[in-house]
């Protein structure tokens, strides 16, 4: 089987690359080998949702009046995102006559893999794991790590519901704690002059301001906003996982992309809608191939708060080996 004939994670891509349908498990499988190689294993996944989820709505008065707590700017941003994803779905249906598929077949196990493994983890080629907390490994990272073309972060944002789940990346209590945690990362010293920083955020409005305000985190790192990518979560039917107009739950997550202040923006870096059926909790699509289209195939990446390794990249966090245990994989025959 040649590289071109293997099952690609890309199910559809518009000519201008502003709209793409990805299969999340396949992005993980592709990330386990270098770009010129063919994946050798399949990852254990969750059953894909066949239909949208019911969306609990808040009360319309008192403490449940969500609109009273949202600034006009945040409301406008939500409306713009809703319009963007609605337009993307309309383009898929009308402009491109695309009706599926929205995912590939998945390797499902009736019983989830055990939380702890007695077998050594599977390590991709040229992957550099830093398994430990930001606080514990900061000095080691600072003294040994190179400069990166891309840094991807998926921080444990404050979230009450997530705190009830078993997750080594315990969510912080508030944004002040998050600022203290993230500012311990010597990111500016390890970003190339034209490097990019891409950060996953939740839909809590204060987080966007926390990053991009004049006194926000990006400014502290000497960065400025370039663009945003939106992951639109859909069921296998292609319908958004939650009602786009829902007040309380949104069917998307944002990836905020920044560069050094004053540096040149890559010509290929533009807004993007990524349509993908979600997998197990906390699993994001691997972004290596998408950013290679922007930065070139030789770009060196670092993923912070990683839950798996990527061939050719560095990964740092308490759970870098979480999905590298053999129980999560099956060899391709």
Task: Outline where the language-model segments fall.
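Conserved beta-strand signature within the Rossmann-like core of class I S-adenosyl-L-methionine
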Residues: 193-202
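Class I S-adenosyl-L-methionine
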Residues: 1-153, 158-182, 204-333
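Short, basic/hydrophobic alpha-helical segments
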Residues: 180-191
